[in-house]
Amino acid sequence: KMYYLNGNIQSEISYKKDVRDGITRTYDPNGKLKVEVSYQNGVQVGVQKGYYPSGKLKIELPLDKNGLTNGIVKIYYPSGKIMSEKSYKDDKLEGTVKKYDESGKITSEEFFKNGNRIK
């Protein structure tokens, strides 16, 4: 664990045989969770999560064992409502990208193939 000068926790990092393994959490100076990342044998895997100072979820970023973005990246408004959903394959946009207003209504929808917009 690492701490800020004010005594609040700055980060918690799990190691296995001197290599990051498990959940790593980073906090702001007020002790609020900012980022949560899972590691397996030194590589980021699973869904990386970022948080607003309020504690509400800001972003979900799915990573594979190679550290590439694979899956649906979700970004949220500070209210907690979904702002956008972007489908990725091997770090490139692939499939549907949807954007929403704060009421939940879809404001735009685009389609991508291999990182290129097709519609």
Describe the function of each predicted region.
Residues 1-119:
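Glycine/tyrosine- and acidic-biased, solvent-exposed loop/turn segments at the edges of beta-strands
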